[in-house]
C-alpha cells in the first residue's frame, strides 16, 4: 500500500512538472506573438485528439492567472463520418464546465461524392472544414481562432516545403485567415509533441480516432515525421536547435533577393551580419545550443527560443 502511494506521488509530481512546462511554453508563445489580448473571445477548435484537448486544458489553466481577461469557447465540427461518437465531446465539455458549440455539417458526404475511391480526401476536407470554422467564428463573435498545431508540426511543415515544394516556409504561430477576416493562433507552437502525448495519457482524455474517414494517410508528412523522430533519438537537441534556427533567420546569408538587396552591394557598402565567412572555419558548440537533458528540471537551463520575461504566469 505504501509503495503504491509512493508511485502515485511520483506520477503526480511528474504530471505537475509536465503541466508546468506546457504552461510555460504556451505562455511564452502567447507573449512572443501577442496571440491573446484583453477582451478576446478565443474559439478553441477541438477535434477530439490529444493536441486540441491539451490546448484547451492549458488555456483554461492560464485563464485563471493571466494578467488579462479573455473568454474561451470550444468548437467541434461533426462532419457526419460513419462511427463518429457524437456523445464523447459534449459529455467531456459539460464535465469541464466549458462553453462549447457542436457544428453539424455533412462534409463527409460531399467529399465522398466528389473524390474517387482510394484517393486522398484531406485537401478538399480541409478546405470545407476551414470555411465552416471561419463562418462559425463570425457567428460566435470570436476574435481569435486557436488551432492545436505544435512545434513538431511546424518543423514537419518546414521540411515538407523544402523537400517537396522548394520553399523555406513553415507554419506561422499567428496569421490572418485566407478570407481576411480572422486571426488564427497556434498556442502550442513551442510545445513538444512527446510532452503533449505524455500529458494526454496522464489526463486520460477521451480521444476520438482521426481515421474515421478512411482516407489514405499523408505519406509525405509521415516520412518527415519519422525522420525527425529518428533524429531526436540519435542526436539529442537537434530538433530544439532547428526550431531555434527558425527564429534566427539571417536574410543576407540566404539567396532570396526579395528579402535582401544583394544588387546594391558595392565597394562602399557596410559589412552585414559578419560579412563573408565562407573561407573561415566557423566555431560551433559541441552540444546543440538548445539541448538539455530529458529529465532536467524546468528552469535548470534556458533554451535559446526565449530570452525575455514571460508575461503570462
UniProtKB/Swiss-Prot annotation:
Its cofactor is Mg(2+); [4Fe-4S] cluster. It comes from the Bacteria. It catalyses: cytidine(32) in tRNA + S-sulfanyl-L-cysteinyl-[cysteine desulfurase] + AH2 + ATP = 2-thiocytidine(32) in tRNA + L-cysteinyl-[cysteine desulfurase] + A + AMP + diphosphate + H(+). One of its GO terms (cellular component) is cytoplasm. [4Fe-4S] cluster binds at residues 122, 125, 213. It is found in: Cytoplasm. It is an enzyme of class 2 (transferase). Binds 1 [4Fe-4S] cluster per subunit. The cluster is chelated by three Cys residues, the fourth Fe has a free coordination site that may bind a sulfur atom transferred from the persulfide of IscS. A motif (PP-loop motif) lies at residues 47-52. GO terms for biological process: tRNA thio-modification. GO terms for molecular function: 4 iron, 4 sulfur cluster binding; ATP binding; magnesium ion binding; sulfurtransferase activity; tRNA binding. Pathway: tRNA modification. Its main location: cytoplasm. The thiolation reaction likely consists of two steps: a first activation step by ATP to form an adenylated intermediate of the target base of tRNA, and a second nucleophilic substitution step of the sulfur (S) atom supplied by the hydrosulfide attached to the Fe-S cluster. Belongs to the TtcA family. Homodimer. Catalyzes the ATP-dependent 2-thiolation of cytidine in position 32 of tRNA, to form 2-thiocytidine (s(2)C32). The sulfur atoms are provided by the cysteine/cysteine desulfurase (IscS) system. This is tRNA-cytidine(32) 2-sulfurtransferase. It comes from Yersinia enterocolitica serotype O:8 / biotype 1B (strain NCTC 13174 / 8081).
Amino acid at each position: 500500500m505504501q509503495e503504491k502511494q509512493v508511485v502515485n506521488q511520483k506520477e503526480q509530481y511528474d504530471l505537475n512538472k509536465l503541466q508546468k512546462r506546457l504552461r510555460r511554453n504556451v505562455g511564452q508563445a502567447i507573449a512572443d506573438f501577442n496571440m491573446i489580448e484583453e477582451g478576446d473571445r478565443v474559439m478553441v477548435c477541438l477535434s477530439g485528439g490529444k493536441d486540441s484537448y491539451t490546448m484547451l486544458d492549458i488555456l483554461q489553466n492560464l485563464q485563471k492567472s493571466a494578467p488579462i481577461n479573455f473568454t474561451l469557447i470550444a468548437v467541434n465540427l461533426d462532419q457526419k463520418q460513419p462511427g463518429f461518437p457524437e456523445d464523447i465531446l459534449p459529455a467531456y465539455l459539460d464535465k469541464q464546465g466549458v462553453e462549447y458549440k457542436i457544428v453539424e455539417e455533412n462534409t463527409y458526404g460531399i467529399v465522398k461524392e466528389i473524390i474517387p475511391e482510394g484517393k486522398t480526401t484531406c485537401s478538399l476536407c480541409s478546405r470545407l472544414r476551414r470555411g465552416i470554422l471561419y463562418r462559425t467564428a463570425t457567428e460566435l463573435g470570436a476574435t481569435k481562432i486557436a488551432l492545436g498545431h505544435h512545434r513538431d508540426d511546424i518543423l514537419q511543415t518546414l521540411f515538407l516545403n523544402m523537400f517537396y515544394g522548394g520553399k523555406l516556409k513553415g507554419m506561422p504561430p499567428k496569421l490572418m485567415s485566407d478570407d481576411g477576416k480572422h486571426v488564427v493562433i497556434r498556442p502550442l507552437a513551442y510545445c513538444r509533441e512527446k510532452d503533449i502525448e505524455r500529458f494526454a495519457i496522464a489526463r486520460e482524455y477521451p480521444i476520438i480516432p482521426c481515421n474515421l474517414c478512411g482516407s489514405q494517410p499523408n505519406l509525405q508528412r509521415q516520412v518527415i515525421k519519422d525522420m525527425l523522430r529518428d533524429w531526436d533519438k540519435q542526436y539529442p537537441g537537434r530538433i530544439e536547435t532547428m526550431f531555434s534556427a527558425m527564429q534566427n533567420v539571417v536574410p543576407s546569408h540566404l539567396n532570396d533577393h526579395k528579402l535582401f538587396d544583394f544588387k546594391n552591394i558595392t565597394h562602399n557598402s557596410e559589412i552585414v551580419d559578419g560579412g563573408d565567412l565562407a573561407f573561415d572555419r566557423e566555431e560551433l558548440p559541441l552540444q546543440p545550443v538548445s539541448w538539455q537533458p530529458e529529465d532536467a528540471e524546468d528552469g535548470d537551463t534556458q533554451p535559446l527560443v526565449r530570452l525575455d520575461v514571460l508575461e503570462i504566469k
